[in-house]
Design a protein with these regions (language model features):
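Alpha-helical promoter-recognition and RNA polymerase-docking modules of transcription initiation factors
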Residues: 2-118
Length: 118
């Protein structure tokens, strides 16, 4: 299966969350070594590597965003994902691959901060 382009999909005016969940379900979990290699490539401008990283972390981002859907602000899951995914992308670019913590642990506080501002 071709790589699912998470960023392009989220740019749509609206999307079918069930279709989105199905597509991200195809993403393989990455080993620490695979993640580090993709981060290094993404930091060098490799768009495919960036997309693979975002795709592999999309399930986690959905779980995180879902924590903010019932805050009484009337914000849709799509809006929350449109906030969280660019933050994850920025975290990929800033992440130190020599850090002992996984990428997602580095990115979560930044995503939470952005989601809390909505």
């Amino acid at each position: 299966m071709d790589t699912f382009n998470v960023r392009e999909y989220l740019k749509k005016d609206s999307f079918d969350i069930d279709e989105y969940l199905m597509m991200i379900g195809w993403a393989e979990l990455l080993s620490r070594e695979e993640e580090q290699a993709l981060v290094e490539k993404a930091q060098q401008g490799d768009e495919e590597a960036m997309n693979l990283l975002l795709w592999s972390k999309a399930r986690f981002v959905i779980n995180l965003a879902n924590q903010y859907t019932n805050k009484g602000k009337g914000v849709s899951l799509q809006q929350l994902l449109n906030v969280a995914m660019p933050v994850l992308q920025k975290a990929v670019l800033e992440y130190d691959v020599h850090n002992e913590d996984p990428l997602i642990k580095y990115a979560v506080p930044q995503m939470r901060e952005a989601l809390e501002k909505i």
